[in-house]
Amino acid sequence: MADTVEEPQLQNGAAPAESETEQNPIPEPQLQTEPKLTGEIPEIEADLTPEEVQSEVTDAKPEEVQSEVKPEEVKTVVTDAKPEEAQSEVKPEEVQSVVTDTKPDLTDVDLSPGGSEEIPIRSTEVEQESTTSVLKKDDDGNKTFTMRELLSELKSEEGDGTPHSSASPFSRESASQPAENNPAMDLINRIQVNDEEGRSRQRVLAFAARKYASAIERNPDDHDALYNWALILQESADNVSPDSVSPSKDDLLEEACKKYDEATRLCPTLYDAYYNWAIAISDRAKIRGRTKEAEELWEQAADNYEKAVQLNWNSSQALNNWGLVLQELSQIVPAREKEKVVRTAISKFRAAIRLQFDFHRAIYNLGTVLYGLAEDTLRTGGSGNGKDMPPGELYSQSAIYIAAAHSLKPSYSVYSSALRLVRSMLPLPHLKVGYLTAPPVGNSLAPHSDWKRTEFELNHERLLQVLKPEPREMGRNLSGKAETMSTNVERKTVKVNITEIVSVTPCADLTLPPGAGLCIDTIHGPVFLVADSWESLDGWLDAIRLVYTIYARGKSDVLAGIITG
């Protein structure tokens, strides 16, 4: 699997809090775009709008599948996204029927790839306050303006004629207009909006564009002004109707991409620019459908998310959006390359979750991509290398993530719809059932020969070892024949209560038997177990952490309702 981000441990019973910001950037990432087979998990459309970052204008889209994220709310989640939790629209797609005896019919929900939204960083919404007001001066005393200041200046200009304060950063420049031959300004000036609210919003954007154009004329190396101007163009693209020709949405996005390119050349460490640039490219790719040109754009978007993550490895939103872009790309690349791209997407979603355990959008997106992989494996029979998980196990894993996302956000209709589709794939009345190798209870230093591979069950309350009764010879009957019978002699079993967990981590230790080591640290001490493979370990790590996170968020009753009916 692709490179992942180091995962934090649960500390003192608390998981990292999730960012509730929503995205409003450009692209509307959706779950995997093509619904296939019996049932598809609903896509989550995301509104992405620039959010306020550094210069205060930054935000992006995707998953819940769409959420607003600003520069610190970055566009992320469901490949196509705009603001997420509060603004994300979830539109389940029609599901195609699947012909298979191994899985239930899925007809109500769209689990196709792309069901999440990308989270934007930019934010130019009128009611949005800038949180990072960065006003940088160049040598001539020019400033890069924040959205809040621009709005304040606009109100002053359109008000009752009250003169501007001498302290206003715009008082000396309001009359200044950029050159008429500026192609970006020409595009913005030609935008026609039908409704009054849209016209008012566009006036603000045009006003801001003039300010940034003037700032760049005075100082062409002002990367903050270039970045903010790109956000204005990206936001203006959202204000253009889909059938508009002059200017088109794509024209504005293309111009925004040019500004991001210039800004990042001047300042290669501008994380927010790479993040929002990737969102703009994703929107351009969506416009082109499943074409070679779209494939190239998706690859460019993935490259920019990679650069964003390199600059800010702690960005779960960028990782989530990166996974969504790869999910979209997997629908276009040649069949021989698809599995590799899908598995890389899985690694990005998993890395996002391990940075933020309650990031329900990434959790849901991981469920949908696993569902799609199960469909492909069922249809093609897998790669034939003998290491692939069987479709049934992939479906079960998919259901675990979707159930967890629903438990964290039970009010999201898209999660509810998807859960109805996959709930029967869970090993009810448990969330997960599988095999782990465990030492004798209370003796983790026992010889490897004493460790036994046994079944474990995980529900909303505990992880429990299941020991089956062993038959043993009791003697001979009256006819002289040996007679055996089962005995239910009580034996100690490994049991870990969710409420007692401190951390859950992988471990590699020579004292453990061969396999993928797992350490569950509890208030009573560590519990060591060994999974059959590292891929199997990923499933156990995520499942236990998610159950703990659901408990820490006070949602255990929701999970209990799912698995107990």
Curated annotation (Swiss-Prot):
Annotated Gene Ontology cellular component terms: early endosome; membrane; plastid; trans-Golgi network
TPR repeats: 189-222, 237-270, 282-315, 326-359, 361-391, 392-425
Record note on quaternary structure: Interacts with BIG5.
Effect of deleting the gene: Hypersensitivity to latrunculin B1 (LatB) and cytochalasin, reduced primary root length and root hair growth defects.
Pfam family, any one: TOM20_plant
Domain writeup: The C-terminal domain (496-565) is responsible for the localization to the trans-Golgi network/early endosome.
Main location: cytoplasm
Listed Basic and acidic residues bias regions: 58-94
Positions of region (Disordered): 1-184
Protein known as: Protein HLB1
Keywords: Cytoplasm, Endosome, Golgi apparatus, Membrane, Phosphoprotein, Repeat, TPR repeat
Cell compartments where the protein resides: Cytoplasm; Endomembrane system; Golgi apparatus, trans-Golgi network; Early endosome
Protein task: Component of the endomembrane trafficking machinery that is involved in protein recycling to the plasma membrane. Forms a complex with BIG5/MIN7/BEN1 and actin to modulate the function of the trans-Golgi network /early endosome at the intersection of the exocytic and endocytic pathways. May be linking post-Golgi traffic with the actin cytoskeleton.
Phosphoserine modified-residue sites: S479
Acidic residues compositional bias, start-end: 42-54
InterPro entries according to UniProt: Endomembrane_traffic_mod, TPR-like_helical_dom_sf
GO terms for biological process, alphabetical: exocytosis; root hair cell development; root hair cell tip growth; root hair elongation; vesicle-mediated transport
Comp. bias intervals (Low complexity): 165-176
Disulfide bonds: none
Top-rank taxon: Eukaryota
